[in-house]
Regions:
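Flavin (FAD/FMN)-binding glycine-rich loop and adjacent Rossmann-like elements that form
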Residues: 1-137
Length: 137
């Protein structure tokens, strides 16, 4: 309301709100534990896995786990690289529930590895892999 009605931003006088997300998204929350936990070493120095089902390529983009509640922490750290890294099926299923698969941001990964795997494109290819694996399971 302030931007539209204050008079300080005349170009916004006729703007209308088109869409608002109904649920705010957290950058990081729960991650499940699979038979393998992807680490930052797997992302930064990929070696390959015999059960690779997807690839990621986003840089490592870490943010403080406490977010704005940690003003003493640097806001973010980015480690760029020019390679893809493999994601094993073992990161996408439960280590103790036989028929439970994960897809999206909850895969078995460390905080630092998650800073690269949490992006939409990587989640999408992982979701495709999990769907295929579930159909074959």
């Amino acid at each position: 309301d302030y931007i539209k009605n204050s008079g300080e931003f005349p170009e916004a006088a006729n703007w209308g709100l088109e869409w608002v997300g109904s649920i705010p998204g957290k950058r990081e929350s729960r991650r499940f534990h699979g038979p393998y936990r992807l680490t930052e070493h797997d992302v930064l120095r990929p070696q390959g896995f015999p059960d690779t089902v997807a690839y990621g390529g986003w840089y490592v983009d870490t943010h403080p786990p406490m977010g704005v509640d940690a003003p003493e922490e640097p806001p973010c750290v980015q480690h760029h690289f020019a390679h893809l890294f493999p994601l094993p099926l073992r990161c996408y299923h439960s280590r103790n529930i036989a028929n439970l698969f994960f897809a999206g941001r909850n895969i078995s990964a460390t905080h630092i590895a998650f800073a690269s795997t949490r992006v939409m494109a990587t989640c999408a290819v992982g979701g495709q892999a999990v769907g295929t694996a579930a159909a074959l399971w």
